[in-house]
């Protein structure tokens, strides 16, 4: 583990770790200055205890997983010791704004998250952020706390998405407390330690654009380019290149969401990462019975963030990012006037945004081709995949199990169809599609066994279904955290058979259909 110009051994004790986190480092977000953030200690969390811990995330950070058992671990990762840190080492909350449900909402956060420092390992730097660490100057009406329920969901989904191969923030730990907080009912507090190379959002850029602060806007863009998109610095227009890269990553990310049936639930612009990673797990959900119009957030009464809408919303959010970057685009070129520069900037930004569909479509087609076990590219492959989704929608066939069981279908005959066919109400419709699928498979050189193995590497058996998370949460509320870690362990091997855990891959029980998730966390 190291920091910028200083090499250091991995933190072996909690005091070492605390000192490392608090050390100043070159190029960190906090060096942007007071216009971007406020330093403050975390609010005390009484009698904290460990609810969940990711050995895998710890190793990514160069930490010894045994640290979780050290006295004071829970205290450090709910922020309690930060009250005694010097002013120059205090955690910070950053300021950002954004659009919520398509409407400009102004300043939004960080309302309950404090970044406590950075760690570097294997040449990569990571920020550690405590979500639920108390009120900040940007909290608006909130109490600054997160609840155990939502914190467990974020921890589990962060780990699940990472092991599905989808870019995401990570979760090192969940720390709980019996401190009560009021939501729709009385719940208990928790803090999630989130990990990412950066927590900069589209909303950070929107904040400085909306407040007419061009110097800060440019400083933020330069920080992101220099730290995360260095190749953009060599482009003819670095800021246009930044927009292009962020748009491309966003398009490819949402294609990966669609391919596993993941609904984010609240794709506001302040919940969009400039690095194109999944961030802010709130009212998310993996689709069970497939419905393209599925809305996982019961607060989303108009279905703005439905599954089928996610690509369109991601594109719209990129337009918001582009608008925020317009004052910077073209600054490196000579223009006869500011009006001419601005007019050209709009044209260039539109050209970048116009490529979103060209990036999203092929990314989704590649993913769907892998899910169908197709190596060769054929013109009708996208139509074949869409036809499957249509009959899945009509029968409300389980999304995850349908694709997983497709691996059993033979290219020669229908003997292996039963497991997937039985998921459909309209089995004649499936039979018609399966005949088309078999005809397409006949063009492939791979035998059934090789294709099935490849498909099982593309189609997870295990995803974080809402009822699985709910079961773990209910037990955790009774101070039994074993199911949280058991479920996390299963989700870290989503493509493996794990026959001893078949129950986690089964169709949801009837009571799962009554579960609702919302922005209340």
Curated annotation (Swiss-Prot):
GO terms for molecular function: AMPylase activity; ATP binding; magnesium ion binding. It holds the Pfam family SelO. Mg(2+) binds at residues 271, 280. The keyword Ion transport does not apply. The keyword ATP-binding applies. Its EC number is 2.7.7.-, 2.7.7.108. It comes from the Bacteria. ATP binds at residues 109, 111-112, 131, 143-144, 194, 201, 280. The active site is at 270 (proton acceptor). Keywords: ATP-binding, Magnesium, Manganese, Metal-binding, Nucleotide-binding, Nucleotidyltransferase, Transferase. It catalyses: L-seryl-[protein] + ATP = 3-O-(5'-adenylyl)-L-seryl-[protein] + diphosphate; L-threonyl-[protein] + ATP = 3-O-(5'-adenylyl)-L-threonyl-[protein] + diphosphate; L-tyrosyl-[protein] + ATP = O-(5'-adenylyl)-L-tyrosyl-[protein] + diphosphate; L-histidyl-[protein] + UTP = N(tele)-(5'-uridylyl)-L-histidyl-[protein] + diphosphate. InterPro entries: SelO. Its cofactor is Mg(2+); Mn(2+). Belongs to the SELO family. Nucleotidyltransferase involved in the post-translational modification of proteins. It can catalyze the addition of adenosine monophosphate (AMP) or uridine monophosphate (UMP) to a protein, resulting in modifications known as AMPylation and UMPylation. NCBIfam families: PRK00029.1. This is Protein nucleotidyltransferase YdiU. The lineage of its organism: Bacteria, Pseudomonadati, Pseudomonadota, Betaproteobacteria, Burkholderiales.
